Regions:
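Active-site diphosphate/adenylate-binding microenvironment
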Residues: 31-118, 123
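Thiamine diphosphate
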Residues: 1-11, 69, 90-91, 95-283
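Generic structural signal of hydrophobic/aromatic residues within well-ordered alpha-helices
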Residues: 17, 21-25, 42, 46, ...
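Secondary-structure junction/capping motif
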Residues: 9-16, 45-46, 53, 62-63, ...
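Glycine-rich, acidic loop regions that bind phosphate or pyrophosphate groups
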Residues: 1-35, 227
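A diffuse structural propensity rather than consistent per-protein peaks
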Residues: 18, 22-24, 28, 39, ...
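Short, isolated positions within intrinsically disordered regulatory regions of eukaryotic proteins
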Residues: 24-26, 42, 100, 256-257
Length: 283
């Protein structure tokens, strides 16, 4: 009775924000790469020539957000996903649409690289009748995926969805945002050639059913076929670097920046940090 007749002050704001989010989600699901003037979500880091080099070596033009939203729209709503580290948790937080409770399992706080695959096995043990999916980058997969073999060994079917941009993409973004060059976060050889690791072949060697999906059509087909399997699967997606979501307005990481530097980018990063700290809450 105390709330009888109460109306929220939000009015139509929530509806407007949801419509704005859906429009942005739709845009990011349809990103198309081109070799002349491609404008990725993470801007001003890699030149067009470098992006073209990745497209050639990895044999792909698939943006990360397009791949992720294709997965969201293709797998069953009651499937369970898990993710932990890299740029993918941020993408999921901004873009993933969950329709069924307890189907979205994210480890945000500690960014535990390698938790994804082992956590997926745990999800399967707790939910044996459901399809479970590990959403993982190539960096985290290389860090730890030993429980993938355990899942195969004990016939506990899990699905690994591996986003391969040939590097530690999230940390590469971070170092370049703070005025540095690209420093040892790209997977390149000592003569600067991009690595193209065949993760599907690795998975096949373990005894899993493996797929290579570098287009939306290939990804949809792989997801549908993987669901039919009675053993663990891995879908390898080669995705272009710098095609994850950006931070949008207000998102900022408080990291150490040198107060003194002869690099203009570092100087600007330090000035930005001081501006942001003035706006931060004093706990």
């Amino acid at each position: 009775r105390m709330l009888e007749g109460y109306k929220s002050e939000f009015g139509g704001t929530i509806t407007e924000l949801k419509e704005e989010w859906l429009a942005e989600r739709d845009r990011l699901s349809k990103v198309v790469f081109n070799r002349e003037d491609f404008n990725p979500e993470i801007k001003s880091h890699f030149s067009q020539n470098i992006l073209n080099e990745y497209a050639d070596v990895l044999n792909t033009e698939l943006p990360q957000t397009t791949a992720l939203l294709t997965i969201n729209d293709t797998i069953d709503p009651d499937s369970i996903i898990i993710c932990a580290a890299g740029s993918l948790p941020g993408d999921l937080q901004r873009l993933w649409h969950s329709e069924v409770p307890n189907t979205y399992h994210l480890e945000y706080g500690y960014s535990c690289m390698g938790y994804e695959v082992s956590g997926t096995l745990g999800l399967k043990l707790a939910n044996p009748s459901k399809e479970v999916y590990s959403i993982v980058g190539d960096g985290s997969f290389l860090m730890l995926h030993s429980e993938f073999i355990t899942a195969i060994q004990y016939n506990k079917k899990i699905n690994v969805l591996l986003f391969d941009n040939s590097g530690y993409g999230c940390i590469n973004n971070l170092q370049m945002d703070f005025g540095n060059g690209s420093y040892y976060c790209e997977f390149r050889t000592d003569d600067n050639q991009i690595l193209n690791i065949d993760y599907a072949k690795v998975a096949e060697g373990y005894g899993a059913k493996a797929y290579r999906a570098n287009t939306v059509e290939e990804l949809k087909a792989a997801l549908k076929d993987a669901k039919k399997q009675d053993k663990s699967t891995l879908i390898e997606m080669k995705v272009l670097p710098k095609t994850m979501t950006d931070g949008y307005e207000g998102s900022w990481w408080n990291l150490g920046v040198p107060e003194v530097s002869n690099q203009e980018g570092v100087q600007k990063a330090y000035e930005l940090k001081q501006e942001k700290l003035k706006k931060a809450k004093q706990y």
